[in-house]
Amino acid sequence: MVLPALEQGGYTYEKQVVIGKRLGGRNHKVDLILTTRQGRKIPVSMKWQQVSGTAEQKVPFEIMCLADAVAKSEGKFSKAYLVLGGDGWTLKDFYLGDGLKQYLKNFEAIEVVKLEAFIAKANKGIL
């Protein structure tokens, strides 16, 4: 569903790409690197939560790592997406709203979106 939407929107992509080091020193692999028609690169991390579990607890750390990657990319990335899919999220509204703003800083370049919203934006070519 995601990949056809990206193609429809004019994006090319690479899957499972290491974009640098995570906070703490391990490799930071994102699910996708999109390339726009204008040549901009956009990292995308996708999290699926079918039932309540640990993926939910990893969201703040992933946002921090994506923000760090954008900041250290020397202009290669101007933004990144964290896509949340599935019905098992108890904190989805908190993450999609402004819940993290009082706890995290410097993550303005990271857009946290529902899977459906990401697909709609991809289809329209407006990521």
PLM feature spans:
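Short, solvent-exposed coil/turn elements at secondary-structure transition points
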Residues: I19, Q49, E116-F118
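Short, flexible loop/turn elements at secondary-structure junctions
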Residues: V17, T36, W48-Q50
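Acidic-basic catalytic patches of nuclease active cores, encompassing PD-(D/E)XK
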Residues: M1-G20
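Catalytic cores of nucleic-acid endonucleases
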Residues: K41, W48-G99
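Domain-level recognition of nuclease-like catalytic cores that cleave nucleotide substrates
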Residues: F77-L127
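Active-site beta-strand-loop-beta-strand hairpin of nuclease catalytic cores
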Residues: H28-V44
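Alpha-helix C-cap/termination motif
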Residues: G9, T35, K72-K76
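Amphipathic, interaction-prone secondary-structure segments
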Residues: V18-K21, R26-D31
